[in-house]
Amino acid sequence: MAQVETPPQTQQRTPGRPADPCIMVIFGAAGDLTRRKLIPALYNLAKAQLLSREFAIVGVSHNKMSDDEFRKKLGDDIHHYAGNDVDPDIWEWFTRRLYYVTAEFDDKNLYSQLKTKLEKLDKDHSTHQNYFFYLATAPRFFGQIVEELSAAGLMDEAGGQHWRRVIIEKPFGHDLESAKALNQQLLSCVSEHQIYRIDHYLGKETVQNILAFRFANGIFEPIWNRRYIDHVQITVAETVGVESRGSYYDTAGALRDMVPNHIMQLISLTSMEPPISFRPDAVRDEQAKILHAVQPLSSEEVLTRTVRGQYGSGVEGGQRVPGYRQEEDVPPDSRTETFVAMKLAIDNWRWADVPFYLRTGKRLAAQTTEIVIQFRRAPFVLFRDTPVENLMPNQLVLHIQPQEGISLQFAAKVPGPIMRLGAVDMNFNYADYFGTQPSTGYERLLHDCMIGDATLFQRADMVEAGWCVVSPVLDVWKALPPRNFPNYPGGSWGPKEADELMERDGRHWRNFDR
């Protein structure tokens, strides 16, 4: 057995439990996700001393490479994607734990070959036969890979003597029926507790902070209901277009790509009831309850409560940008939406008559993900002689990206001899207060998988509940193809119909300049 080395210690340990000894197997290891997100996140965990000393990584892809070529390829990228100075000693320790297997995912021989390799590496690195498999592949391979892993005995936990887990990237199905079918396929060969359906948004500090903000502060939870909240807005806006993902995106669209996963998770954390504890299933039970309480839209409501759009050419950051139909690998007559806005309702006591407005899109005016809690207006009877009709209601904004933080807008007297009100902000920024930039989210999620904490991962029932909300919209949109695409210029806030969706209710989106 090889001597176990400890990662070089160059800084104080980050608080938290070190990961269990294990081997991580990345299917799709030659892809962008591995070099841009996974390897930098694992390096950051090593630097923070949150990786076990007994650790190794095996990359699997059809690209032909040796171990050394794989290490060099990742070494060339790490300085660009790690986001900070790379410590050469830590990186050297890390690269000695990188291995590579060249194979096609549908080659049955791969899995017996992989089992032999893992058994050897387990002895070399003392990883206690703990393995987890990250499926950074096309969705069509998800079920087949897990079936083959199970058939090879690689998902067998030997009665709890060791653990075996699998992380699955989105998209998890392309509609409700395919999501159910994939869940059934997976659960026919592994247990639910072994499946970690990942959504990297849930690894972000502000998303995790939603529960702490709500339930650890006595001043907010008592007013977190229909008596005090007028409505909720959720915006996930991107300034970029589809870039090199045209062929994938054109088969998915903004609705499938963002709503049943990212946005439904944000809705659940914002609106769920207090869990009995922070144990994984206690939290996820409450999330599942609220997702099942989101009312699916009728066919008539789809026509009045949803908006779809597609970006045309425009100006982004002072530069002319092409329209969606001019992007690489996109058909010139594509009817795929790049923008979605919806008005949803939650059918329970806490949120009765409180609309949830959501929007997401590409080539919008600003890069931002945020949750806006807009409170009901105060009675301005005391200020009847003061111009208050243009004063914004109180807003609590949870900024998720790019700058993570929380802000509260409220009214205050403007200095001067007369009573005049103005809107002011109280701002909390993670980077300013804690002196560090929050991580990408993958660090937290990978670490959670290695310690067996599934709180921030979706269960089968949560995935299916998200698709239940989206499916009626997909059906109506398929029956009634759009006739006015493209209908918003790149660099704008989307089609005018999205503004009208809220204006009909006497409300407005929270828009701002970049």
Feature annotation, model-predicted:
Residues 1-168, 172-514:
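Secretory/organelle targeting and membrane-embedding segments
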